């Protein structure tokens, strides 16, 4: 998943998408 490990804020955005089932 892009963002994680590079930008914690972006990683949080991706985690939110996963939680919403949109990833």
From Swiss-Prot:
Keywords: Hydroxylation, Thioether bond, Toxin. It comes from the Eukaryota. GO terms for molecular function: toxin activity. Major toxin belonging to the bicyclic octapeptides amatoxins that acts by binding non-competitively to RNA polymerase II and greatly slowing the elongation of transcripts from target promoters. Residues 9-23 form a propeptide. The keyword Phosphoprotein does not apply. Signal peptide: none annotated. The typical symptoms of amatoxin poisoning are gastro-intestinal distress beginning 6-12 hours after ingestion, a remission phase lasting 12-24 hours, and progressive loss of liver function culminating in death within 3-5 days. One of the few effective treatments is liver transplantation. The modification (3R,4R)-4,5-dihydroxyisoleucine is found at residue 1. The modification 4-hydroxyproline is found at residue 8. Processed by the macrocyclase-peptidase enzyme POPB to yield a toxic cyclic decapeptide. POPB first removes 10 residues from the N-terminus. Conformational trapping of the remaining peptide forces the enzyme to release this intermediate rather than proceed to macrocyclization. The enzyme rebinds the remaining peptide in a different conformation and catalyzes macrocyclization of the N-terminal 8 residues. There is a cross-link at residues 1-8 (Cyclopeptide (Ile-Pro)). There is a cross-link at residues 2-6 (2'-cysteinyl-6'-hydroxytryptophan sulfoxide (Trp-Cys)). This is Alpha-amanitin proprotein. The modification (3R,4S)-4-hydroxyisoleucine is found at residue 1. Belongs to the MSDIN fungal toxin family.
